[in-house]
């Protein structure tokens, strides 16, 4: 059974420790710096909505990868590397408590970055905050679930980063090859693509519920994959 007290304690420990872990701190710092550079230097005052949403989509998707996927995988792998995971699991802390604490930590970082990105880009008159928050938060949850699987498979923080990097490239690079029927159709159903489409539709005032359904379906698939890996490998 999950223990709220233990989850809160793990969450507090993680939030304090992230400032001393370069694998983790690099991600939000890089994302917010990128958002600032885009918002301050690449978007003129008279920039069309299409350009603003395109750059915003790029940063939000990068945040889902670097914070959502990367940090979640590193948090799990870190405990393996330090050999503290076995101690936690053999104590009164359950595997579910451990995972919940890490999910809360990663969710907090990713969502805070998304909120800061929103205000850096100054899109209050283009995108309603409620819709933006819903879309990016759903995307963050899908990314975090995806990252948890990498954390289970990785032996340490370095291997977690090495495993995530090629996947990040596969997510980022395909948009450069538009026009390929196979890539277009595969990419269309991935949550990162749906985040971009959803934010574009939101800016146009015509957000389709299909975006929410597909992002949620991504989360469901990632959760099933994680569940299979967890049953076969466990945490330790």
Model-assigned labels for residue ranges:
Residues 57, 65-70, 100-101, 127-135, ...:
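Short alpha-helical transmembrane interface motifs in multi-pass membrane proteins
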Residues 52-90, 94-117:
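Hydrophobic alpha-helical transmembrane segments of multi-pass membrane transport proteins
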Residues 22, 137-173:
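A structural motif at transmembrane helix-loop-helix junctions in multipass membrane proteins
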Residues 95-96, 103-154:
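Alpha-helical transmembrane segments and their short interhelical loops
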Residues 17-43, 55-71, 163-176, 214-223:
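Hydrophobic alpha-helical transmembrane segments of multi-pass membrane transport/permease proteins
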């Amino acid at each position: 059974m999950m223990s709220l007290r233990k989850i809160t304690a793990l969450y507090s420990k993680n939030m304090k420790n992230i400032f001393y872990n370069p694998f983790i701190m690099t991600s939000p710092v890089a994302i917010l710096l990128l958002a600032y550079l885009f918002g301050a230097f690449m978007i003129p005052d008279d920039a069309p909505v299409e350009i603003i949403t395109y750059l915003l989509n790029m940063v939000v998707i990068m945040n889902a990868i670097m914070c959502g996927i990367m940090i979640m995988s590193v948090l799990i792998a870190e405990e393996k590397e330090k050999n503290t995971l076995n101690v936690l699991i053999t104590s009164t802390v359950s595997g579910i408590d451990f995972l919940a604490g890490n999910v809360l930590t990663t969710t907090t970082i990713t969502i805070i970055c998304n909120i800061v990105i929103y205000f850096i880009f100054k899109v209050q008159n283009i995108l309603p905050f409620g819709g933006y928050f819903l879309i990016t938060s759903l995307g963050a949850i899908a990314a975090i679930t995806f990252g948890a699987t990498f954390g289970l498979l990785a032996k340490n923080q370095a291997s977690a980063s090495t495993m995530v990097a090629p996947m990040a490239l596969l997510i980022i690079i395909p948009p450069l090859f538009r026009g390929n029927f196979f890539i277009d159709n595969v990419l269309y159903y991935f949550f990162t693509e749906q985040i971009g489409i959803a934010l574009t539709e939101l800016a146009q005032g015509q957000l389709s519920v299909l975006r929410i359904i597909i992002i949620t379906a991504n989360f469901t698939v990632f959760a099933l994959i994680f569940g299979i890996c967890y049953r076969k490998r466990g945490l330790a």
